[in-house]
Amino acid sequence: MIADLSLDADVAEQTQQTLGADSNFAQRHPLQIAVCLRQLVAGQDFVTVEFGGRQIVTQILDVDSRNARFVFDAGSVADDNDALPSARQLTFRSLPGGIRTEFTTFDATPTQFDGLPAFEAPLPTVLHYVQRREFFRVQTPVLDPYIASGRYADGGSFRLELLDLSLGGIALKTADERFGSLERGTVLRDVALQLGGFGMLRLDLEIVAPRQVSTAKGDRRFVIGCKFVATPGPAERTLQRVVTQLETRRQALTPRR
């Protein structure tokens, strides 16, 4: 039987106080949580587990999204491994590639994985996945690209393909020379983002990272990193679905080690 994934009220409050402002970066969709944990598996990243004044260093070994559970390696100290199953809560922390991943779960049970001691636990209901310099980004489709369209301040129009996407912003790629003169801090108002089957969003974009690149043929292109000035709730939920689906597709195409 899958253990109850609901957070006790006092534990939820403690977790919220600990993470504070980072709550804006919380992942709550079970599929996205599973994707984040699978990235720890693929990267063989070390994870610290804290419980009852103890700590072990482990790795996530397997993620079962269908049954909402995951498996992690046993620690190197027998006493800690013996104490872990009776812990009221387990706090996991990792820093893969500068991205802070943190979550809390409960009721770990001893198991075996590939014939070696391990633990199994329910997927967390909330996972905080925070990249210090920018949100976690996914590449957008190449064959059926997403499109950003709008108008310059002088009234001229633009229509550009998205290079990547995150909950915090987008990157645009273009040969349009007008984008070469746009400075950091420029705001593009009411930009329409055509996101394939997810529909269209209208958001204001602030240019934060403009740069030039050269193609293999030596042609000049402009890559414009933009952040969303604001993301209303419905827009953020749509972006979450897009990021989840794109990353899930990418993971499905990545060979498992």
From Swiss-Prot:
Keywords: Bacterial flagellum, c-di-GMP, Nucleotide-binding. It comes from the Bacteria. InterPro entries: PilZ_domain, Split_barrel_FMN-bd, T3SS_YcgR, T3SS_YcgR_PilZN. One of its GO terms (cellular component) is bacterial-type flagellum basal body. GO terms for biological process: bacterial-type flagellum-dependent cell motility; regulation of bacterial-type flagellum-dependent cell motility by regulation of motor speed. One of its GO terms (molecular function) is cyclic-di-GMP binding. The keyword Endoplasmic reticulum does not apply. It is found in: Bacterial flagellum basal body. Residues 131-244 form the PilZ domain. Its main location: other. The keyword rRNA-binding does not apply. Belongs to the YcgR family. HAMAP family: YcgR. Acts as a flagellar brake, regulating swimming and swarming in a bis-(3'-5') cyclic diguanylic acid (c-di-GMP)-dependent manner. Binds 1 c-di-GMP dimer per subunit. Increasing levels of c-di-GMP lead to decreased motility. Monomer. Interacts with the flagellar basal bodies. This is Flagellar brake protein YcgR 2. The gene is ycgR2.
